[in-house]
Amino acid sequence: MHIWVDADACPSVIKDILFRVADRLQLNVTLVANQLMRVPGSRFIRALQVPAGADAADAEIVARVSPGDIVVTGDIPLASLVLEKGGLPLNPRGEWYTKDTIAQQLTMRAFMEELRGSGVDTGGPAAFSQADRQNFANALDRELARRRNHSGPR
């Protein structure tokens, strides 16, 4: 199992959680970004810089993800592609994307884009909070504990 991170927009507190998890559980974590990323010196953590461009990091993650891998992303279209490949997408607020919910999330995203395109101010997401950080840590911990106990993806 591998943890892939759509790192350009991932909050640093989430990356810090992932760095600790990688070393504690000896799991491979790769941050994929189109900018240079600094990562701690660890044999389990690496950064992969891709060329600048729309969705270059997404394409790299999709090309490399295997069934059962976890992908940390807030990008709904990327999450949909990860699900198609058998990966488990988790957003930085601790919510798992699932085959049951992804179509509705894609529809809502398209609707909000249409509203913004017509000049409607839809606001943005709420500021990232301590509760979001905790929700992420708990969701990741539950999945990793489940895998240790049952040796397989959910």
Curated annotation (Swiss-Prot):
- Give the Pfam families listed for this entry: DUF188
Q: Where are the transmembrane segments?
A: none
Query: Which family does this protein fall into?
Result: Belongs to the UPF0178 family.
Which NCBIfam families does the entry link to?
Answer: PRK00124.1 (NF001095)
Query: What is the protein's name according to its record?
Result: UPF0178 protein in pahZ1 5'region
Source species of the chain: Paucimonas lemoignei
